């Protein structure tokens, strides 16, 4: 097969030489990330059920999850949730095969509950949350497209995916900061810190200002002095991480900058997530498939979480574009690599309408040949992504 792969060389300075950069990551306990996580966990659970029953994944998309914030009354040493968080799990799934019924609603409820229990330590899914699955049937034409792709799945949409490599120092710092704050080790050392974490970085030349918003768990904090000590300790740990990752940058760390210590108006929550009061969440409003929000870099607005991992190019092409960019970067002398993939509905996913690869820097003709080869090989094996996504080896937010 001869694929439409175009490799272009861009003679310009790499992005790291720009004066300004902004990067954001919403942590796993942020309402938007919780919506993503629930959507993806439901999709994976359905995939496993379909495989167990029928030996293959059936048509579904569960990429519509809405979190409606509850109401809470946090206070030092305690607090309560007085109106639960409402979570609506919608989408489409195959509920019948012949006369056999698949309990789609039950699977969705169990998957969402399990995900919340694993992700937000202080969230009581029996008291603090109401989960309502409302998953319907997919349209006949898209189910038909799904079923027709026996050897290679057929694209369910005309859509595009974008990716780039490598990550900048600022991007790595933002990603790793959230991962560290939500790591088991930090939660053991500082159990007062909740899972709802948001990290924003502004780089101006060589200076990075890192702003962290971290929900604190009220029942674990005795008073304002205790709260302040936790914030200061968290700031120190983030600063230590920044010294490792961004040693050649001047990094300034801020934590919970909206706090007013004199009025004791601080970021307290009962559960560790702002979804308990005042902050709603939706699939696709947060991190892109590389775990970041990067307004200075190419991004797709596609909500990848919850989409089926078989033929939904909105998911597969964004994952593949980043993988393709990384591997091309590793195998060539390019300073940066940018990849764009375009599908056409009804056509095999391994044969995109267009593959556009940009190599930035002083590259050779051999580098261009390598880029084409890597792109071609990854497209040839695109169906391998499905199992890796189902097994949770690939994250999409």
Swiss-Prot record:
Involved pathway(s): Amino-acid biosynthesis; S-adenosyl-L-methionine biosynthesis; S-adenosyl-L-methionine from L-methionine: step 1/1
Keyword Glycosyltransferase carried by entry: no
Signal peptide stretch: none
Gene Ontology biological-process annotations: one-carbon metabolic process; S-adenosylmethionine biosynthetic process
Catalyzed reactions per annotation: L-methionine + ATP + H2O = S-adenosyl-L-methionine + phosphate + diphosphate
Domain of life: Archaea
Gene Ontology molecular-function annotations: ATP binding; magnesium ion binding; methionine adenosyltransferase activity
Enzyme category, top tier: transferase
Keywords: ATP-binding, Magnesium, Nucleotide-binding, One-carbon metabolism, Transferase
Gene3D superfamilies: 3.30.300.10, S-adenosylmethionine synthetase, C-terminal domain (3.30.300.280)
Cofactor: Mg(2+)
EC number: 2.5.1.6
Keyword Magnesium: yes
Binding-site residues, ATP: 136-141
Function: Catalyzes the formation of S-adenosylmethionine from methionine and ATP.
Family as reported in the entry's similarity comment: Belongs to the AdoMet synthase 2 family.
Name this protein carries in UniProt: S-adenosylmethionine synthase
Species name: Methanopyrus kandleri (strain AV19 / DSM 6324 / JCM 9639 / NBRC 100938)
Gene designation per UniProt: mat
